[in-house]
């Protein structure tokens, strides 16, 4: 899978990313709008967590571009294109967890990851492998449509391998 996005170095554990994630999202609206416009997608946003070490990890907001949109990246001004990079997700096995459907499912991601790591993983016969973690935000929205707006959810993809 090839995604296009932008990153920031987060400190600490992915179990505690909520505040950093919120601040990053609020501070980078322009980048989000550029990518959404280029790929014509505003309901599916990817979060990529990679390059983990004792201090933290790289956190990306990214989008999956159609081939034609990736080719169009060559035609945008250099100062804009330099804000973004391609992130290649290697093939491998992932376990996928989902949040409940609600208006703000991103607020449920830290709790979901904590439960997956502390409750599911120890008894599963699997361990985390060295690959990016993926969050997929399904951010449906239509003005005045509470049923749709409350059906948003997130997927958490954890890279795993048999012990």
Regions flagged by a language model, labelled:
Residues 1-163:
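A solvent-exposed interaction/effector surface
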